[in-house]
Amino acid sequence: MKVGVVGLQGDVSEHIEATKMAIEKLELPGEVIWLKRPEQLKGVDAVIIPGGESTTISRLMQRTGLFEPIKKMVEDGLPVMGTCAGLIMLAKEVLGATPEQKFLEVLDVKVNRNAYGRQVDSFEAPVKLAFDDEPFIGVFIRAPRIVELLSEKVKPLAWLEDRVVGVEQENIIGLEFHPELTNDTRIHEYFLRKVI
């Protein structure tokens, strides 16, 4: 198994470490790579788009040539997980986006950028998961908000109280929060099971 973390901006090393730990817990052979160039996509079984700043990530993905190949691979069934800004990158509709911003538009959700306010308004809270009874501590940092599910294909994956904060659509997972900033690898393990 080969997992690529888009390594252009954001919390890349944390996702790499969390994915390595999840691979070990699942007792799978595998490697995790720092994706910076399109030629590195050869042989990749799954991709993670980390948090950071969505405008910067979008611009850098286009500049490095990663944008179009990743979009095509995801449309063809490649498992992808986007967290925080990564969720914005995956979303079909983005409120508060500028006209020049370009998104992958592969996940049937409408999101609102920075819906929780500035970095000082960041918080941690227990999140309920669809696949596990034990709460997960969600780290929300200038997080986007999922405001609408746009098709029946989108299934809620995580809730903060009664509000959906994580979704799954076939091969795609999108999360408002940062699972890589905890020592809990359950979400990364769940994602990796899409590959095996």
From Swiss-Prot:
* Active site residues per record: C84 (nucleophile), H178 (charge relay system), E180 (charge relay system)
Q: Which GO terms describe its biological process?
A: glutamine catabolic process; pyridoxal phosphate biosynthetic process; pyridoxine metabolic process
What are the entry keywords?
Glutamine amidotransferase, Hydrolase, Lyase, Pyridoxal phosphate
Q: Which cellular component, as a GO term, is one annotated location?
A: glutaminase complex
Question: Binding positions for L-glutamine?
Answer: G52, E53, S54, R113, I141, R142
| Reaction(s) this enzyme catalyzes, per UniProt | aldehydo-D-ribose 5-phosphate + D-glyceraldehyde 3-phosphate + L-glutamine = pyridoxal 5'-phosphate + L-glutamate + phosphate + 3 H2O + H(+); L-glutamine + H2O = L-glutamate + NH4(+)
Q: Which Pfam families match?
A: SNO
Q: Which GO terms describe its molecular function?
A: glutaminase activity; pyridoxal 5'-phosphate synthase (glutamine hydrolysing) activity
From the UniProt annotation, give the residues forming the signal peptide.
Answer: none
Q: Which CDD domains match?
A: GATase1_PB
Pathway entry? Cofactor biosynthesis; pyridoxal 5'-phosphate biosynthesis
Query: Which InterPro entries did the record assign?
Result: Class_I_gatase-like (IPR029062), PdxT/SNO (IPR002161), PdxT/SNO_CS (IPR021196)
State the EC number(s).
4.3.3.6, 3.5.1.2
Q: What does this protein do?
A: Catalyzes the hydrolysis of glutamine to glutamate and ammonia as part of the biosynthesis of pyridoxal 5'-phosphate. The resulting ammonia molecule is channeled to the active site of PdxS.
The record's note on quaternary structure and interaction partners says:
In the presence of PdxS, forms a dodecamer of heterodimers. Only shows activity in the heterodimer.
Q: Which HAMAP family match?
A: PdxT
Into which family does the record put it?
Belongs to the glutaminase PdxT/SNO family.
Protein name (database record)? Pyridoxal 5'-phosphate synthase subunit PdxT
GN (gene name) = pdxT
